[in-house]
Structure formats: structure tokens, C-alpha cells
Amino acid sequence: MTEENQTVISQFLLLGLPIPSEHQHVFYALFLSMYLTTVLGNLIIIILIHLDSHLHTPMYLFLSNLSFSDLCFSSVTMPKLLQNMQSQVPSIPFAGCLTQLYFYLYFADLESFLLVAMAYDRYVAICFPLHYMSIMSPKLCVSLVVLSWVLTTFHAMLHTLLMARLSFCADNMIPHFFCDISPLLKLSCSDTHVNELVIFVMGGLVIVIPFVLIIVSYARVVASILKVPSVRGIHKIFSTCGSHLSVVSLFYGTIIGLYLCPSANNSTVKETVMAMMYTVVTPMLNPFIYSLRNRDMKEALIRVLCKKKITFCL
């Protein structure tokens, strides 16, 4: 074995985004504003749902968990990206890289499972309105949330442990803005066939199957409403399914295209842009799409503000 191959990598260099140096400050301000918008929007949702008893329903239980997941998902990558954009040496320790990978996978998987739970909730609400409260009991809702958190732990840990067993020799430059699976596998000088097989198999379980379940749920919603077509029914389809499906398509579409159907023609820049879509853009848009345009959330915000105002005056 050569001396080069015996070198142990203690840190990686995150090359970040291919942004010209003269535009760094502009993009730094843009990404900082996007991150702050994500944090503020999701925090507002979590706080409102906690404070307003009218929002203590299955739908908003899932939504509060989704908002927390979005907040954490974005926080796994964005602070490090912002730090590296201001640093001369954008490095990350090997242990820090594995930690970032674990939490990135954890919250990505959690979002996937929570989106399924939300789709099922809407399916029951529209197709079985008279039995909604009996089907979506508090016990079932809490069980779905807890199951989502537990399943993601095992999946994220599996990929992280498989990555930790690999050897990294001379090259330590990651052409990405965070420690993602694909660029790390390309840097490894070990056999990565097991990792790639697990990505394909487990990806089908935590990405493809949830995506199919969401599509099936909404297909049955549409079929149920079309049996008795009406303007109100069609409006319900668009108001209930449209926003959710747009985010689902953005989230799952980029992940499936990036990890499960990779193209040999995919450039590093293209992969980075796709990663930005679901790590930065989607968590930022979710509060606006799911809640801040929602009448219940607006009314809850008014009630909370009025209550605080009265308390302050007293």
C-alpha cells in the first residue's frame, strides 16, 4: 500500500456552490434571508398550534411536527453553508460530516413519513367525514407521529454507519455545500457496492412507497368527489390537494431523481441545485403553502395576538 493510500482523512473541504466571488455577498444575503424566513415561518406555526386550542386537531398535530422537521432539516445544512461562505477554508471534521449526514437523512425521512400521515388525514376527512374523529383518534395520530420518528432513526443510522466504515484516502474535497451521500461515495477509495445497494433498497421503502401512498390517497379523494360532481366538491379538491401535491412533487421529485434515478449526465452543479430545492426552498415554502394562507391559522393568529394584547393591558 502506498503512503498516499495510508493517509487518514480527518476533515473534508466543502466546496459549496459555484458562485463567482464578486457575487458572494449577494447570495449570502439571499440565503440568510431564506433561512430566517424558514425559521420564522415554521416557528410561528408551531407556536400558534401550541397556544390555540382550536388547532389541537389531527391535521395540525401533523403540521406542527412537519414544521419542526422543516426547521431542523434546513438548520442541518444552512448555518454551515452560511459559515463557509464567509470562511477562507470551508472545512468540516470527519465526525462533523457524519453527524451532518445523519441528521440530514433523519429529517428528510421524517418529512417523508409525515407527508404520508397528512395525506391519509385529508383522505379520511374528505371520504369519511362522519367517521373522521373516530378513525383519526388521538391514539392513532400520536402513534403515527411516534412511528415516523422511530423509523427515521434506524434508516438514518444505517446509512451513517455504512458510511463510517468506508476509507477515504487522498481527496477530501466535496463538490457540494453539505455532506451528502453521493459525493462522499465518490470520494471513498473503498468498495461502495453495499452502500449503493442499501440506498436503492431502503430508498424504495422510505421514498417511493410513501410517495405512492400519497398519490393513492389523493386519487381516492378525487374519485370520491367526482362520484357526486359539484362546484363545492371540485373547489375542495383544489384547496385540499393542490398545495399539498405541489410540495410533495417538489420534495419527492428532486429526491427520486437525485438518488434513485441518477443520470450519468448529471453534473455537480445540477445535483447541487436539485439539493437546494428540497433542503432550502421546500422548507421555506411549506409554511406559506400549508398554513399562513390557511383561514384557521389566520384566525388563530388574531386570537393569540388579541389575547396577548388584553393580557398586556391588564
UniProtKB/Swiss-Prot annotation:
Disulfide bonds join C97-C189. The keyword Hydrolase does not apply. Residues 50-57, 121-139, 220-236, 293-314 are cytoplasmic. Pfam families: 7tm_4 (PF13853). Keywords: Cell membrane, Disulfide bond, G-protein coupled receptor, Glycoprotein, Membrane, Olfaction, Receptor, Sensory transduction, Transducer, Transmembrane, Transmembrane helix. It is a multi-pass membrane protein. One of its GO terms (biological process) is signal transduction. The chain crosses the membrane at residues 26-49, 58-79, 101-120, 140-158, 197-219, 237-260, 273-292. This is Olfactory receptor 1468. It comes from Rattus norvegicus (Rat). The gene is Olr1468.
